[in-house]
């Protein structure tokens, strides 16, 4: 299977998010990269499903809570940005303070 660098990056995000979800299901608190992967994967899949940018920007703040992550992660994660592919093209989705 030949993947472009862009496709490899997206696949890596989804694999990392899957691992992070497994750790979360075992009761482990997530670190910065794991939290970022879960939120980014959520945004990419939401775009693929046809959700709007504004909807994803709002919903992206509900994916994880402070109880899901290690101490200090919400403060380190000031925003998550991803270029997501929507039915009408690629758009930048930015979620400010994704872990309120």
From Swiss-Prot:
Its EC number is 3.5.1.5. It catalyses: urea + 2 H2O + H(+) = hydrogencarbonate + 2 NH4(+). Keywords: Cytoplasm, Hydrolase. It comes from the Bacteria. Coiled coil: none annotated. The keyword Cytoplasm applies. It holds the Pfam family Urease_gamma. GO terms for molecular function: nickel cation binding; urease activity. GO terms for biological process: urea catabolic process. One of its GO terms (cellular component) is cytoplasm. InterPro entries: Urease_gamma, Urease_gamma/gamma-beta_su, Urease_gamma_sf, Urease_subunit. Its main location: cytoplasm. Pathway: Nitrogen metabolism; urea degradation; CO(2) and NH(3) from urea (urease route): step 1/1. PANTHER family: UREASE (PTHR33569:SF1). Heterotrimer of UreA (gamma), UreB (beta) and UreC (alpha) subunits. Three heterotrimers associate to form the active enzyme. Belongs to the urease gamma subunit family. This is Urease subunit gamma. It comes from Frankia casuarinae (strain DSM 45818 / CECT 9043 / HFP020203 / CcI3).
